[in-house]
């Protein structure tokens, strides 16, 4: 008889395998949400939102959680940024960053896709990790700002 913990462990192992497949095949979906000035009736920028492309994950946060567990969150984030920059070349862009990506140092590498964007870019730190985590990321955030990008905390009202 399979115990509940064993089922959870098997499911986690399946999700980790699925993340490896997604990242290796560069199969990350993306949609763009317009950020508009309703008074001027014009689009100011677009927010690039990663989308789950695997049936095993019920949501995008679940996909990123599995990527953290699999040690692939930096690669998944980089794929997201690459697609966003390639597909939204003519507008200012808001990019969500999972705070766990700071552990890998990829965000400040000169070859990161976000540095190819020729319009204003705002890095949004996602609400998935409590705010206390941000003190550990101060030097990375400072370096991103020095490179001319704006910073924002995404969904600040989420309770973190």
Predicted regions, residues:
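Juxtadomain coupling helices with adjacent low-complexity linkers
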Residues: 2-3, 16, 58-62, 68-88
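Active-site core of bacterial EAL-family cyclic-dinucleotide phosphodiesterase domains
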Residues: 4-66, 153
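Short, contiguous strand/loop micro-motifs
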Residues: 6, 22-24, 71, 125-128
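Catalytic core of bacterial c-di-GMP phosphodiesterases, primarily the EAL and HD-GYP domains
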Residues: 44, 72-141, 149
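Conserved protein-kinase N-lobe ATP-binding Lys motif
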Residues: 54, 67-71, 99
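Interdomain coupling helix/linker and adjacent catalytic-core signature
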Residues: 59, 158-160
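Walker B catalytic acidic pair
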Residues: 127, 154-156
């Amino acid at each position: 008889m399979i115990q509940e913990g064993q089922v959870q462990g098997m499911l986690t192992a399946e999700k980790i395998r699925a993340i490896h497949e997604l990242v290796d095949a560069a199969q990350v979906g993306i949609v763009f949400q317009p950020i508009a000035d309703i008074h001027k009736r014009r689009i100011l920028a677009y927010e690039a939102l990663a989308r789950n492309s695997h049936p095993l994950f019920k949501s995008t946060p679940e996909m990123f959680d599995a990527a953290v567990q699999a040690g692939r969150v930096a690669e998944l984030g980089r794929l997201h940024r690459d697609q966003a920059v390639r597909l939204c070349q003519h507008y200012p862009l808001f990019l969500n960053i999972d705070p766990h990506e700071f552990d890998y140092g990829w965000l400040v590498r000169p070859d990161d896709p976000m540095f190819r964007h020729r319009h204003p870019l705002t890095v949004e730190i996602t609400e998935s990790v409590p705010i206390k985590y941000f003190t550990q990321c101060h030097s990375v955030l400072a370096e991103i700002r020095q490179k001319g990008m704006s910073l924002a905390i995404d969904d600040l009202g989420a309770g973190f």
